Structures are given as C-alpha cells and as structure tokens.
Amino acid sequence: MLTLPESLRDAFKEPLGPVTIDADELLAAAAETRGERAAPDAPIIAVGDVVTYHLREAGRVPDVALIDGKTERETVDAEIGSALAAADDRRLSVENPAASLSAELLEALSEALSDADPVIIEVTGEEDLAALPAILAAPDGASVVYGQPGEGMVRVAVTPESRTEARELFEALDGDVEAAYKALGRVPDGDR
C-alpha cells in the first residue's frame, strides 16, 4: 500500500520525540502527557519487541503492541521472545513487508486501538514504519513508543503538533495515501 522511498530514508532516521533508556522515566512522561491533555485513559502503543518487553518489565502492558520477532533485523534474544510469546493478550497476525505499510497492518492497528483490552499485532515482515500510523490513529494524549537503533526508546506524545509531523511523513510515502487513510479508519486532517 505505502512504501518508503530511498530519498526519504534519512528523514525517517530522526527521532520524532525524546530518546530515553529508562522505561520508568518514559512511563512517567506518558502519565504527565495524559494529565496535560485531560486524557486519563489514553493508550500507550509500543512499536517493536524490545520496547514492548521493557514496558512490560516496568509494569505497563502496552494497550497496543506491534512486534515482529526482530530487533535491528536480527532475531530478538530468547528472554524477550519467550516473555512476549507468553503474554496472554489478544493477538492479530498481519503481513507487512520491510519499509512498507500494508493495508492489513493499518486495519489491524485501527481494530486494536478500538479494543478495550491489550492487543498484540504480530507482524510477519517488519513493523518499523508503524509509529507513523499509530500517531495518526491514536487519541490525543496517547503515547507512541518505538526503538531508536543504538540509542533507546523514543516516546511521541500524541498531540495536534505530533500528528501534523507524522502526517507530513506519512503523506510523503509512495503509494495510495488515500486508501491508506481509509484502511486506518481516518481522514487526512486527523478526524476519525
């Protein structure tokens, strides 16, 4: 559906929010955002196996987690893989090629965000670009957390400003952006 053009790869390497290695600090910042945005039930969306594992280890099961069994294109270590496999959250399985966003992934993300219980989206392929549609689809006050290779975890507070930045990157991807918004259950201006 959408693919990352070679010309944009560098733009996608820049973190969209602050980077930390401390899950407790990240969770405190997420709670602060929920308070500031008057959104006490705003979800936390984790993109990546290692990020999901660290949040769970810190005592916070992500409301939505997207995992692919890999970190930096290598299989995650056994401890992380076993811990995530043992999680009893509802699971959705999707296919999503590298450097892409498939309709299947976008539809699953929309479905998972509407579920009151935690959902793990198991991705065959890669989930690396999933932070963008997560920012676009999540409610105000949510936090989207993803891994920054070699640095730590990035937390993006979902606000009108972060949605604008995500929208610009999302719409710069190659493919049918209108159909991608439809699969995500959103319209380009961010309304549901």
Swiss-Prot record:
Function: Catalyzes the GTP-dependent phosphorylation of the 3'-hydroxyl group of dephosphocoenzyme A to form coenzyme A (CoA).
Entry's family note: Belongs to the GTP-dependent DPCK family.
Reaction catalysis annotation: 3'-dephospho-CoA + GTP = GDP + CoA + H(+)
Class of this enzyme: transferase
Pathway in which the depicted protein is active: Cofactor biosynthesis; coenzyme A biosynthesis
PANTHER family linked: GTP-DEPENDENT DEPHOSPHO-COA KINASE, UPF0218 PROTEIN TK1697
Sites where the protein binds GTP: 49-51, 68, 70, 127
MF annotations from Gene Ontology: GTP binding; kinase activity
Domain of life, per lineage: Archaea
EC number: 2.7.1.237
InterPro entries: GTP-dep_dephospho-CoA_kin
Transmembrane segments: none
Coiled coil: none
Protein's organism: Halorubrum lacusprofundi (strain ATCC 49239 / DSM 5036 / JCM 8891 / ACAM 34)
Gene Ontology annotations of biological process type: coenzyme A biosynthetic process
Identification of the protein by name: GTP-dependent dephospho-CoA kinase
Keyword terms: Coenzyme A biosynthesis, GTP-binding, Kinase, Nucleotide-binding, Transferase
